[in-house]
Amino acid sequence: VTDILGREVSVPQDAKRVICMYASTAHIMALLDKGERIVGASDGVTRDQMMVTKYPAVADLPTPYHEGAVNAEEVLALDPDLLLIKEEMYLKDNERQKLDDLGIPYVVVDYYDLDGLRKAIQVMGEVFGEEEKAQQYLSYMDEQFTYVEERVKDVPEADRPRVYHSITESTKTDIVDSLCAQIIHAAGLIDVSADSGLTDVGKNAMVTLEQIYNWDPDAIICNEYAVTDYILAQQKWSGLKAVQNKSVYTLPIGATRWCHHGSIEPQMAVLFLAKTFYPDRFEDLDLRETVLTYYADYFGMQLDDDTITKILSGKGMRESSPSLEME
């Protein structure tokens, strides 16, 4: 297969023991119905309730790398026949050398935007011989984007809500052309950080509270409910109009955090944001029904009402990281 960096990699025809050193690769494996083959994964995966429900063994998976550094002994102990890694790891000379020395095939799967996500899902489809399943999912993704974009395209710029997106930490936010900025734009919204030209080397950037006051967004959307609660409770955030108007929302969490740079479900975030900010234009969109059908069709899971409520509230589907820092 050819990975996202254009490397030609010979992979086992039917890889049975896979280590996912990038959380999103584990989520894509679940999408392709191959999650039972994961023998090691990033610790975030073990906190994802949907992964654990579908594949109970995930809860106890070891993480054979720490802070981006591969532990060769731990990798070998898991006897993997394939490693899935993120670009950042490959670009570190010492880590790449370690991977090469292991002699286990590794595929780089990573993304920064929608096109990158499409490519990542296609590459994973090829790795596991599930090209058709990957393509069906991508078609669904594109259909949802088009559905929303068509309905909001005539909203004048001046009438589009300006939103600030808090990614895991209150002052970590979107950069230009990132996956989350694309999600927010598709939903007919203005992303105050990305649209002000904010850039950084990674997938997001840290800003100051002063900067957020300068933007004074109409609404704030948060990836963690703990951050939503924090922003609403903190005196220093209370001068923002979004806080005064209680326009601070927690984003849903399903198989992945829908509006996160590691999301494999950006179309679901677009639907949620469209329904939240343009209820009149999306009166016929039943999010609960959509969620029910979507997880049945693409993840083979029959969700009960309680789980759908948790997904849409962003509460109870993922254990917060203990390192959740607040500004």
Regions found by a protein language model. Name each.
Residues V1-Q13, E327:
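Short, low-complexity disordered leader/linker segments with a strong preference
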Residues I4-G6, L61-E73, G197-L209:
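Short helix-initiation/N-cap motifs at beta->coil->alpha
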Residues S24-H27, G44-R47, L82-L83, E88-L91, ...:
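Solvent-exposed loop/turn segments at secondary-structure junctions
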Residues V176-K203:
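Alpha-helical, coiled-coil/dimerization segments enriched in small aliphatic residues
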